[in-house]
Amino acid sequence: MESLNSAAGLCVKSRRVEEIAMPAYWVARSRVTDPVEYKKYTDPLPPIFAKYGGNVLARGGRFQIMEGPEKFGRFVVIEFPTFEQAVACFNSPEYEAAAAFRRNGAGEVENVIVDGGDATPR
């Protein structure tokens, strides 16, 4: 947006710079050891993710490990509007209550939240 400062008799152009929010991705790799208890963890998750703007992109579908150990057998990818919203969801009381079922021996999970976009220095 450009504006002219005519009150001071100057012709000055100013630009408003807006920061564009990048999405973030919560990636979970899981190994289920007790399916009944694990379901108590997964059942309440969709509305919790939605509350924080999360959108499940992949959950429990077909996969192929291309490289590395075959330790995990379930994969989930959730997109959030921002990194901060994804972290807030993970740290929320609602998620903590659900995760308690998994943490009590129903499965092993590796959770990672990563910013979208290419942040590699050039």
Language model regions located:
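C-terminal structural segments of small proteins and small subunits
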Residues: 87-89, 96-112
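Short S/T/G/P-rich N-terminal loop/turn motif that feeds into the first structured element of a domain
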Residues: 4, 9-91, 115-122
